[in-house]
């Protein structure tokens, strides 16, 4: 590992403003303290813009000092799905047995960008509100994926990040 020392007593939460990530944010505040918790949100062309507005409001109400909004609008030009295109009716599954709201690589991008932010802010702990038990067919919510990307970002940045999925 590199000589850069990351703070193990702080965390950054991948924060959509939805129910799961809000639960993670509140849990992180309880565990690490308000001053030690950062939030990162993503605008990627998603249908539920209200969640992003909620993320801003929730961070403000909770007193989160460090809330970063990362823009990934280009993602909507790379993939078509019901989560990003309001003209597509949401359905439970398609040919590949994934719901048509599946955005390929979304959580991988979120985790990578958040790890870059965490590295710059000297933060070890990355929290994301995915749950294998409730993954709705999304392969990037599975425990194996989370373990794999944790290893990959640690190797890519020569650090010892810990990705937490407390739900």
Where are these regions (language model features)?
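ATP-dependent adenylation/nucleotidyltransferase module used to activate substrates
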Residues: 2-167
């Amino acid at each position: 590992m590199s000589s850069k020392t990351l703070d193990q007593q702080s965390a950054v939460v991948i924060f959509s403003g939805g129910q799961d990530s809000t639960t993670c944010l509140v849990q992180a505040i309880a565990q690490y303290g308000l001053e030690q918790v950062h939030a990162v949100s993503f605008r990627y062309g998603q249908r539920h813009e209200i969640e992003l507005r909620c993320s801003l409001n929730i961070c403000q109400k909770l007193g989160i000092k460090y809330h970063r909004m990362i823009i990934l609008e280009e993602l909507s030009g790379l993939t078509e799905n019901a989560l990003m295109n309001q003209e597509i009716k949401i359905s439970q599954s398609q040919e590949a047995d994934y719901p048509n709201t599946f955005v390929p690589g979304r959580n991988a991008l979120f985790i990578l960008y958040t790890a870059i932010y965490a590295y710059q802010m000297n933060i070890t702990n990355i929290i994301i509100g995915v749950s294998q038990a409730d993954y709705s067919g999304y392969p990037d919510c599975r425990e194996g994926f989370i373990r794999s990307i944790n290893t990959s970002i640690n190797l890519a940045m020569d650090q010892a990040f810990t990705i937490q999925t407390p739900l």
